[in-house]
Amino acid sequence: MTTTTLDIHQILKLLPHRYPFLLVDRVLDMEKGKRITALKNVTMNEPFFNGHFPHRPVMPGVLMLEAMAQAAALLSFHSLDIVPDDNTVYYFAAIDGARFKRPVEPGDQLTLEVEIERMKAGISKFKGRALVGSELACEATLMCAMRQIN
């Protein structure tokens, strides 16, 4: 079993996302064709905290899902031995069973755990969880599609 780690510089070479929408800071381990564990450090400097909510900042649930999808994209690229270029896009195709169990606040470290359930014909299905420490913050089944654009 070989695992892979990625720092932010390697992540920037693989994902097209940039501030304020890059939501993966580090990959702790990644097993080709199986799973990934990644981190998102949540700080008070996140732009979404200005309006969500000023009196009690909470990370929007949809951004937890997006963070899991970005981790899933990294896992897909690694599993398929793909280095994406400007013509490669990775889209959400579906989100099922999304559940939000605890708020994520400034100072929290979000651990993203994503496992491949199925990969076929450019469409992948994943089971994802986002945790703060040992507490489940969010879980969902994600489907993503990789496409080439011109």
Swiss-Prot record:
The keyword Cytoplasm applies. The active site is at H52. Gene3D superfamilies: Hotdog Thioesterase. It is an enzyme of class 4 (lyase). It comes from the Bacteria. Pfam families: FabA. The keyword rRNA processing does not apply. GO terms for molecular function: (3R)-hydroxyacyl-[acyl-carrier-protein] dehydratase activity. One of its GO terms (cellular component) is cytoplasm. Keywords: Cytoplasm, Lipid A biosynthesis, Lipid biosynthesis, Lipid metabolism, Lyase. GO terms for biological process: fatty acid biosynthetic process; lipid A biosynthetic process. Its EC number is 4.2.1.59. It is found in: Cytoplasm. Belongs to the thioester dehydratase family. FabZ subfamily. This is 3-hydroxyacyl-[acyl-carrier-protein] dehydratase FabZ. The gene is fabZ.
